[in-house]
């Protein structure tokens, strides 16, 4: 973590993507970044492999919590090896939150709740359509609330979700100049 006046800069590459620099197809999306007492939280979706087979894999939801000081993962998640930008890479502490065989995660988001709890929302896309879900994790990555179905409500991949007083808020648009504000009661966890 580098400090410069009022701003802090953190530089690390804890999660790698298969392929060469400049490739547009990564089969992955960053959902968001947040800070908790145990480190920097990364939430996103990706094909689990760092090999050519990633092109045929469904995107799964993942979380990493990385120390801004040591740049090491704070989770005891899985380890994955492969190639990224022409070099051999190893990602450690990747906790996969989904394992869909017939669906993909198409969007995800993260917010921090009271007591440093991590709120994760995502969209699951399958042949039956798109549905959204949420789960709550502790600052150490322990699942406090298992995947809970929200329904056929989209997330906004271009805007962060907001959490306040037990509720999460986000907006979507239907393409007809109409915006919808969504409010979901999550509650507070001990």
Which role does the model predict for each range below?
Residues 1-190:
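Extracellular, repeat-based ectodomains that mediate carbohydrate processing or recognition
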């Amino acid at each position: 973590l580098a400090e410069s006046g009022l701003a802090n800069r953190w530089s690390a590459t804890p999660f790698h993507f298969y392929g060469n620099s400049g490739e547009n197809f990564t089969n992955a999306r960053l959902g968001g970044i947040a800070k908790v007492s145990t480190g920097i939280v990364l939430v996103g979706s990706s094909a689990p492999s760092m090999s050519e087979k990633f092109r045929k894999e469904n995107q799964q939801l993942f979380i990493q919590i990385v120390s801004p000081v040591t740049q090491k993962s704070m989770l005891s998640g899985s380890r994955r090896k492969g190639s990224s930008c022409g070099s051999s890479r190893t990602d450690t502490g990747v906790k996969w939150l989904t394992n869909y065989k017939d669906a993909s995660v198409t969007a995800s988001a993260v917010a921090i709740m009271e007591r440093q709890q991590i709120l994760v929302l995502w969209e699951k896309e399958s042949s039956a359509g798109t549905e959204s879900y949420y789960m709550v994790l502790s600052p150490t990555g322990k699942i406090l609330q298992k995947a809970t179905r929200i329904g056929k409500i989209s997330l906004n991949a271009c805007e962060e979700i907001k959490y306040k007083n037990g509720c999460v808020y986000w907006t979507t648009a239907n393409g007809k100049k109409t915006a919808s504000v969504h409010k979901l009661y999550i509650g507070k966890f001990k």
